[in-house]
Amino acid sequence: MTDRKIRQISALLIEVYNGIMQVEDKYLRTTQFRDITVKEVHTIDAITMYDHKTTTAVARQLRLSPGTVTASIDKLVRKGYVVRLQSKDDQRVIRLGLTRRGRLIYRAHQSFHRQMTESFLNGMDLEQVDIIEHSLLNLQTFLQIADEKGDSNEND
């Protein structure tokens, strides 16, 4: 692969990432969820409607420190999107759940991503979709390795 092609794809990745963030932000500003940021929506997405995760589990998924996620969750609790639930199994463990409002934004965000993905894959055959999936898995692996290296550099 040529250096020019790599630069071109790199620029496209940056442009697409920034575009997704801008569109998500614009969408939020036109809904009843004007009081929430895109980062907070991604925290809600990590909490999910289906599991009652701990703050540590959410932090791990978002690749953020537990302290950073705790601050975000505190805001989401104040805004009425998230509740803290005491574990039935272990009273010391606090789990996270979504309020009705949190579930609404969760579903809206899931719908947005589904529409975006369907649009992205529109007109592709299964072989092309498999290539896209393989490429995204390569990117995900790179990000995981880079994240782990960053963690080990912080400990030096």
Predicted regions and their residues:
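N-terminal helix-turn-helix DNA-binding core of bacterial DNA-binding proteins
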Residues: 23-65
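Charged, amphipathic alpha-helical coiled-coil/dimerization segments
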Residues: 74-131
